[in-house]
């Protein structure tokens, strides 16, 4: 669960929509730090081999399938998602990456 501007957003719901987008192999959604909203929806996306994805294309897909406030505010395209030995995505590592990239006040 992430809270953006006082609204509860379930990452799994956003992930399920993004996984139906053409060219998406894997996706993981986490909350990224935001000074105004507290957290914003950030999607880490792995493209299928040979597929080119764009934030605009994924955004258009999300707008058709979920409420606007739930769509990711940022897309990060990666070659692979960090996983543990059992194949579970390590969302903690993704959040740490976002916190390391965010400017400090």
Could you say what each language-model-derived stretch is?
Residues 1-70, 79-96:
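AMP-binding/adenylate-forming catalytic core of the ANL superfamily
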Residues 96-105:
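Acidic/polar alpha-helix N-cap and adjacent early helical turns
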């Amino acid at each position: 669960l992430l809270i953006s501007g006082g609204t509860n957003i379930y990452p799994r719901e956003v992930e399920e929509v993004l996984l139906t987008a053409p060219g998406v192999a894997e996706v993981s959604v986490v909350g990224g730090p935001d000074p105004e909203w507290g957290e914003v929806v950030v999607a880490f996306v792995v493209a299928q081999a040979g597929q080119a994805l764009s934030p605009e294309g994924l955004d258009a897909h999300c707008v058709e399938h979920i409420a606007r406030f739930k769509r990711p505010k940022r897309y990060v395209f990666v070659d692979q998602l960090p996983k543990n030995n059992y194949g579970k995505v390590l969302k903690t590592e993704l959040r740490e990456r976002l916190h390391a990239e965010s400017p400090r006040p």
